[in-house]
Amino acid sequence: NILGLSLFLSTFYLSEVQAESPAYAVQDNTTVYQSKRPDSRLFVSQTVDNEIDRVSKMLKNKKLAWMFSNCLPNTLDTTIHYRTQDGEDDTFVYTGDIHAMWLRDSGAQVWPYLRFAQQDKKLQKMLKGVIRRQIKCILFDPYANAFNDGPTGGYWMSDNTKMKPELHERKWEIDSLCYPIRLAY
């Protein structure tokens, strides 16, 4: 179970950090580990929020509970741009602080939410939108790995390839196709 392994490794890491750093040894998580979720979350899933509450209550280590409650929803809170376009679900996923969507990264970013999709119609629509967007991107340029949200141009426009303003980067690798197939499957 990937969640169990993540929690185990996080606990191990936190115990190592606590041993080396007195700042992390603070028992009161209101000082060092103050949780700050964005006030304007981009996408909210009540199912994911309920799971965060459920798991956090089970964790005896407050720092680990804080880490879990901030990590699990981070993609939803900060990178998901869901909308309908021409009556169809469409989801553009920012990759970190860059306002572009990488095929590999967007698939990996939403992967943890698949387990909640059966219970959450809103989450299903968002995931369907990611798959639709990835397919649309691949059909637009099968050799690109990262796309803009429309014809905005960008830093890599001077690449020695057939760049178009809808492309962020044209550096295709096999995982540029594997991750969309994995997500759609």
Residue ranges and their predicted role:
Residues 1, 87-89, 167:
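Intrinsically disordered, low-complexity segments enriched in polar/charged residues with Gly/Pro
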Residues 3-12:
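Bacterial N-terminal signal peptides
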Residues 20-104:
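Low-complexity, Ser/Thr/Pro/Gly-enriched N-terminal "stalk/linker" regions
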Residues 99-127, 131-185:
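Aromatic-rich carbohydrate-recognition surfaces in CAZymes
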Residues 15-18:
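Sec/Tat signal peptide C-region and signal peptidase I cleavage site
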